[in-house]
Amino acid sequence: MWYWILLFATMAVTIYWYSRKQPFPEISGRFALILLFISIILWLATNAPRGGGNDLFPAYLASIVGGSAVIYGVIKMSVTNDDVVVAPFGGILFCIGSITLLSERWSGADQVEQIGSFILASTLVILEIYLIFRGLIIGVQGISWSKSGLRQISRGLIHGDNGAISHFEKSWDMEHQWINAMSHAALALIYEKENNETSRMEHVVQLEKIGGWGAVDEAWTETIRKHLDLS
């Protein structure tokens, strides 16, 4: 049981640390709290006066929670582009829980079942490697930082490590120049609001190189102007 307690607790701390570096930290932050809560529940279970529970319960729990996190995380990673942490870490939990359950049946399984279990376990590991590569190695997409930058403007958070300027400056994308155009436009408007003509012109010049203001959706600039109270 202590193995599972340490696993859930360690993953909770690790995910929380990663969440602080994300454009939308609350998504993976909530997942970290769920895992920490589970580790506390398992710890309380070890101190219960009466035992006799299912020793495989933590493995089932890891499989269910991890599998659910993978589904949710893949949507956030590939569809809405909001988070890249939940899916790979959920996959780790799912792999550990599932492989533990498969290994428990290994000795009593026939050859066909053993081959099937091995293929299934190998497939899970390969998929997990992809999730780690896509989420933790490739990392956050530029569009995610651009979206979070707009949110920070709406909150009035402009400066600092978690301000709108910092988020937009992390949103550069070598493949999608339209994202760069949106970010340069946003930064130009922010510096216009602050009467920083030098910085504003730097981003206007960069914006002109990739199509100018015409390359930016009017709805984007109008929304930013509204939040910045620019006429």
Residue positions per predicted region:
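Boundary/linker segments of alpha-helical solenoid repeat arrays
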Residues: 176-181, 209-222
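Long, contiguous interaction/recruitment modules in multidomain scaffold/adaptor proteins
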Residues: 1-144
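Residue at a conserved register position within TPR or TPR-like alpha-solenoid repeats
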Residues: 152-155, 191
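Tetratricopeptide repeat
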Residues: 162-165, 172, 201, 208
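Structural register within alpha-helical repeat arrays
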Residues: 148, 185-187
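TPR/TPR-like (Sel1-like) alpha-helical repeat modules
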Residues: 188-215
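Residue-level detector of the short coil/turn that links helix A to helix B
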Residues: 156-159, 195
